[in-house]
């Protein structure tokens, strides 16, 4: 770039910063462009699939799936992880179905959790916006988009037609919310339900509620499905669950994660550690026996899970090694070309 253009650009950048404040415009290569802060989902496999070690702060995240697939469980686990980091969390319960006892079992500190049960969709989104603008709340969960009923629909009669009202409400709210979310660095998670489109001949007939706005504004979209049952004898004690990263603006998308959700306990982290440990050759498997650092830790996966629950130091050690191996590798690779250029 010639000198005149450089001077003109510097003057323009100075004017923009003077008028709109520092950070209104920046070069992506500047040191101020920090790595995106992430909050763990409580599942190691999902954190790895997301590429940055969790859900990104200052962004909108959508989690959708069929009924009883684990959507609320996943968000409550994320809240529990955020609270461990000393963060303030809020739960906007539009479905009026939050179970505090279950949330407590998943590790959520109920006493510190902010909960709102709004009457209308407008009220829910206004509360969400006020919490975000305060800059004091780090995680806001809206459960769910399908339950955000517009005021006109609530005040109208049962048979009245209200075409596109919810989609318009979501579009308007997200236009208003996104700038505030970025400025306050708040993680906003929308839980959504699945509906079927009528008359679809080719492709998937599934769609999410609330129009298309959320699909565009979300930086991360997770599709969560139940793929099987976990049985103890004849009794079903949990679900095998698969999460697909359908959209990801902060890392490569389309990755998958499989894990177990145990009833009354949440995500079984120990089972993930065993599977990933064997895959990465951190945990040795010979027949039905599992060993770590040359020490036998159990026969059969169920016994090893029990052993790791009792020996938290070992499970933390395995988790740290897996995170270092599977997450930091990406950062190192990203930095290598820059070092080559400097030379």
Swiss-Prot record:
Annotated family: Belongs to the RecA family.
Biological role stated in the UniProt entry: Can catalyze the hydrolysis of ATP in the presence of single-stranded DNA, the ATP-dependent uptake of single-stranded DNA by duplex DNA, and the ATP-dependent hybridization of homologous single-stranded DNAs. It interacts with LexA causing its activation and leading to its autocatalytic cleavage.
Pfam families named in the record: RecA (PF00154), RecA_C (PF21096)
Species classification: Bacteria, Pseudomonadati, Pseudomonadota, Gammaproteobacteria, Alteromonadales
Species of origin: Pseudoalteromonas atlantica (strain T6c / ATCC BAA-1087)
Protein's name according to its UniProt entry: Protein RecA
Keyword Oxidoreductase recorded: no
Subcellular location(s) per record: Cytoplasm
Entry keyword annotation includes Phosphoprotein: no
